[in-house]
Amino acid sequence: MIFSFFLLSFLLSCLSSPQFAIEKEEKKLSRLICMKGLLEPRELSHFFMQENPHADAQKVWALANFYVKEAQDEGINSDIAFVQMCLETGFLRFGGLVSEDMNNFCGLGAISREEPGLRFPSMEIGVRAHIQHLQAYACTRDLQKELVDPRYKWVQPRGKSPSIYGLAGTWASDQAYGEKLDALLERLESFLLTNCCSKKIFFF
């Protein structure tokens, strides 16, 4: 009995030790757009598949990798860009003016049935256009890659929305747009905290 008591006490002390606490440390994601994202494609993909388990897992995995890579190249927060894609496409359910085959993941140019939005030749280029458009809203520095966003020049003044909250009434007419992005980032943070020890990948 005494041995069992001390064993239990030892295990409890281990679970409360710093190395175990690190496993449960919450990742606080920045709401600033011009900075490096924290999350890996695996984490973004895992979150996405929980929100829409019927999505094409291979496509989600590819998108997550494109977002992390393209955002890193332009100094943009990939966590925000990926979450914005989730909001704009309804986690790739679409259903609005933009259709899946357009490779338009942020509603670029979507105004009406007559102007349903821009079409891009591949997922990679569609993601790049999204990142470039975010860069125009959040930063004043030059692009690192060739311009593929036809609407880039229409963002004036450059750098007017350094955080997600500045996208309300600018990127989107919805005055609650920034709050919706914030709510999605909070969901992502909660997901990471709950699933911090999970290494499951849905794809391979």
Task: Report the location of each language-model feature.
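Catalytic cores of secreted/periplasmic lytic hydrolases that degrade extracellular macromolecules
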Residues: 2, 15-204
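Bacterial N-terminal signal peptides
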Residues: 4-13
